[in-house]
């Protein structure tokens, strides 16, 4: 389904609530689709009424859909290029991980998949696989009433049986809407969640995007001192290596009620379906089945406690007209040279405004498959010993105010230091005893010196050395993070040659003036024996999906010509690229319109 437009239909789809449909559709990037759609039907109208829309709007939606042929009944005979069947009756509880959202594991198979095992705990110490972060988070799961009510009911059941969250677990609740907190309060479930440590920390993007905040210093020290295998469990969309927290070596995605259960278990080694959470007063083991609420109970709570007025009270004030009677603001921003949050951007000056040579490019990195935007530009907490941390300290910020990479995206001097700053990066140019060394590392050529990635970037920037990146399949998957393209462009990368690109990231590369090139089938960095000592030229006319020539100049003086596919897919993309990127193109169009 990669790059496909999906439309769900059938008996199962018609029975899904709109909240469940939205949860599925919001995961479209994770299963690689361009879009995931459901038809308009009575479930749609029911949701509009539940969320407080005016009856006139509900009627308009129904009338418009029926008049335009978009109503479910009129799509019953629609023909599709491909039809994939999925039986909803086969759905069971799952988690996803480690490291990728598509690594689905049924909770009944945790032991056979090597995730759960013997829980080896020493009194006073965290166990192997300790869950250091348990977060009910993400715009996807927290806007689904069934998921949130299920989490609240599981918390209530756990509290009644005397279960508690393990002390090393940092737990949080970040609903995607204030309406969620209102209906949890209405159902008397918010106090139950708070009792287990799941109080509301924000109505915003938090742990899912690597912004969980700092760990308890004592817990952090133990993780470092013992080199502990620590994990995170969250109800987010993505769990790529290094994304959630620098000290969570791996992360697992789970539903909100499972997140609560893992906070009580305290370790990913716990077999969540089979192991005992504790004992009842009469000595009976407490298992997940004893905590999990029934569908009937969830439905009853939703019917009683989720009300239209909750949504109206949250959203109606957002659309009220307000007149600002304050001081007039200058139309031009007054740049502050000491700011680490917003700084005058460099995209229209210096090397970024100059012509890309496509000659003599040296590899900044040679990478494998499935490189994510979290590898390219992480968004999580900034550590003191990182390049960005050292820069912020030099700017006078105390460590507790470093915040996350995501919050400093308006300051290119901070944000560009995030380029390849993921400690889980595997740059095949950096090896020890024949094995690739994990870390934010690079090898500067022609000297062959291994150093931190940012120092290598600075070295090449000072030399005005044009750069290239060589990669495997699915380059740039994950969040559509603009800095994953901005960072490499600021570093001096002119082209990226990969076996394949994630759709949105390829578009972002074009928008930043970085040329995406694709190896032809059967050709890879491995078949070409690329080790990073080479220099590269790109020859040919850059037209939509043209075949260009990648010239590889070997260290021994030999050269090799390799055909590659130009992934400027349209004439418009070619125009944007040749202008230097979308920002330069915008500036050109603006100046031309002013001159006209």
Residue positions per predicted region:
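Generic beta-strand/beta-sheet core signal
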Residues: 9-11, 19, 31-34, 38-41, ...
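Non-catalytic terminal/interface segments that mediate subunit docking, oligomerization
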Residues: 84-188, 192, 323-497
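Extended hydrophobic packing segments that form well-structured cores
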Residues: 247-255, 259, 266-268, 272-370, ...
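Hydrophobic alpha-helical bundle architecture
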Residues: 192, 199, 215-225, 234-235, ...
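Acidic, glycine-rich flexible loop/linker segments
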Residues: 280-294, 505-576
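Structural motif
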Residues: 3-7, 34-37, 83-85, 130-132, ...
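Mobile "lid/hinge" segments at catalytic clefts and subdomain interfaces of large enzymes
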Residues: 1-62, 71, 149, 155-170, ...
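Conserved phosphate/anionic-ligand binding catalytic regions in large, soluble enzymes, centered on
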Residues: 18-40, 99, 132-150, 203-208, ...
């Amino acid at each position: 389904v990669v790059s496909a437009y999906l439309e769900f239909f059938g008996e199962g789809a018609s029975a899904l609530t709109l909240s469940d449909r939205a949860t599925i559709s919001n995961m479209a990037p994770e299963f690689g689709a361009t879009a995931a759609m459901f038809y308009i039907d009575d479930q749609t109208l029911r949701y509009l009424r539940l969320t407080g829309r005016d009856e006139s709007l509900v009627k308009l939606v129904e009338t418009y859909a029926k008049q335009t042929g978009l109503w479910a009944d009129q799509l019953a005979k629609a023909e599709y290029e491909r039809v994939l069947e999925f039986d909803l009756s086969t759905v069971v509880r799952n988690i996803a991980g480690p490291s990728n959202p598509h690594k689905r594991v049924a909770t009944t198979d945790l032991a056979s998949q090597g995730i759960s095992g013997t829980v080896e705990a020493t009194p006073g110490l965290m166990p192997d696989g300790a869950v250091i972060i348990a977060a009910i988070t993400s715009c996807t799961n927290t806007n689904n009433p069934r998921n949130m009510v299920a989490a609240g009911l599981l918390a209530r059941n756990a509290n009644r049986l005397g279960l508690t969250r393990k002390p090393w677990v940092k737990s949080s609740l970040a609903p995607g809407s204030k309406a969620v907190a209102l209906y949890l309060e209405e159902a008397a479930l918010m106090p139950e969640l708070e009792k287990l440590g799941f109080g509301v920390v924000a109505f915003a993007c938090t742990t899912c995007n690597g912004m969980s905040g700092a760990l308890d210093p004592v817990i952090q020290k133990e993780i470092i001192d013992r080199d502990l295998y620590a994990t995170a469990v969250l109800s987010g969309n993505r769990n790529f290596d290094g994304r959630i927290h620098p000290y969570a070596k791996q992360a697992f995605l789970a539903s909100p009620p499972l997140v609560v259960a893992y906070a009580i278990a305290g370790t990913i080694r716990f077999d969540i379906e089979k192991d005992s959470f504790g004992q009842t007063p009469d000595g009976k083991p407490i298992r997940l089945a004893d905590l999990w609420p029934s569908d009937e109970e969830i439905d009853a709570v939703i019917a009683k406690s989720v009300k239209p007025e909750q949504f109206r009270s949250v959203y109606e004030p957002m659309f009220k007209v307000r007149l600002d009677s304050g001081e007039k603001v200058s139309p031009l921003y007054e740049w502050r040279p000491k700011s680490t949050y917003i700084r005058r951007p460099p995209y229209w000056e210096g090397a970024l405004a100059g012509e890309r040579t496509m000659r003599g490019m040296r590899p900044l990195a040679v990478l494998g498959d499935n490189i994510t935007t979290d590898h390219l530009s992480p968004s999580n907490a900034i550590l003191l010993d990182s390049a960005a941390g050292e820069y912020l300290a030099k700017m006078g910020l105390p460590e507790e105010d470093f915040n996350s990479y995501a919050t400093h995206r308006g300051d290119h001097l901070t944000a560009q230091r995030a380029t390849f700053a993921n400690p889980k990066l595997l740059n095949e140019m950096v090896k020890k005893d024949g094995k690739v060394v994990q870390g934010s590392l690079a090898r500067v050529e022609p000297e062959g010196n291994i150093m931190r990635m940012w120092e290598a970037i600075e070295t090449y920037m000072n030399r005005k050395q044009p750069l290239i990146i060589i990669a495997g399949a699915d380059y740039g998957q994950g969040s559509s993070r603009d800095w994953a393209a901005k960072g490499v462009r600021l570093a001096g990368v002119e082209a990226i040659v990969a076996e394949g690109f994630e759709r949105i990231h390829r578009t972002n590369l074009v928008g930043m003036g970085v040329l995406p090139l694709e190896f032809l089938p059967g050709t890879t960095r491995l078949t070409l024996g690329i080790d990073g000592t080479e220099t590269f030229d790109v020859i040919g006319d850059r037209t939509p999906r043209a075949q260009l020539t990648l010239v590889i100049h070997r260290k021994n003086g030999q050269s090799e010509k390799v055909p590659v596919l130009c992934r400027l897919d349209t004439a418009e993309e070619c125009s944007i690229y040749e202008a230097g990127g979308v920002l330069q193109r915008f500036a050109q169009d603006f100046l031309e319109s002013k001159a006209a």
